[in-house]
Amino acid sequence: MKKTLILLIATLLCISVFAQRRESPDSKFIYMTSFGYATGLGEIHLMNNTGEELKTVQNRSFDIFVDQQLGYQFNPYFQMSLGAGFDFWKQTAFIPIYLNITVNFTDTKFEPIFYLNGGYAFKWYVSSVPDKMDRVVHGTSTGPMGETGIGLRINLNDRVSLVLAACYKNQYTDIRYTIPTPDEQDFSAYSTNAVQKALYHFAGVRLGVQY
């Protein structure tokens, strides 16, 4: 985790140094504050001690997120940023730190964009109480994260822009659950005794202000 954080900080420093050497009339430092909502997609297959499927859990998680980015626009079509934020799930929360690459397809007031985020999500908190419906605890460990999206940037003036995008997110983390033990009381509503890795998928929208 420390190596990931150091790598991302070093990347931002490299962006700053490179930007100072390659300035153009349209180059500038940029900041963006954004927030959004995404809903869970797909299924998670849980295994028992013998490697057989125990049950399938629907990804009913949701993700409410807020981010801040600091970066550099090299020209009207390309920018790179370092981002950090908070991701709030139903029973847990993450602090993602990531590198952002954004491509603008035009240099007009209304610009179609494509962006890609990649980094690592640290834990903020997690509840140990299983979900009442599925009797699992989602998102219990740190892990790599990614996001991609397409949208529209609306340039209000030379400094301020609105960004609206449809996004797809994923988070690699642990899911905790209970493997039934014969002749023992079922405590799956209160605790867990098994854990496995899972890749969570989300789709949603992001709204931001760049300045």
What are these regions (language model features)?
Residues 27-29, 60-64, 93-97, 110, ...:
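Residues that define the transmembrane beta-barrel architecture of outer-membrane proteins
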Residues 31-35, 82, 101, 114-118, ...:
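Membrane-embedded beta-strand positions of outer-membrane beta-barrel proteins
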Residues 34-38, 197-211:
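Outer-membrane beta-barrel "beta-signal"
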Residues 37-41, 86-90, 103-105, 118-124, ...:
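Transmembrane beta-strands of outer-membrane beta-barrel pores
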Residues 43-51, 92-98, 125-133, 175-182:
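Outer-membrane beta-barrel translocator domains and adjoining extracellular loop/strand segments
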Residues 50-106:
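Glycine- and aromatic-enriched membrane insertion/assembly motifs of diderm outer-membrane
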Residues 51-56, 85-87, 102, 131-138, ...:
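Extracellular loop and loop/strand-boundary signature of outer-membrane beta-barrel proteins
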Residues 77-80, 109-112, 154, 158-162:
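Repeated loop/turn-to-beta-strand initiation elements of outer-membrane beta-barrel proteins
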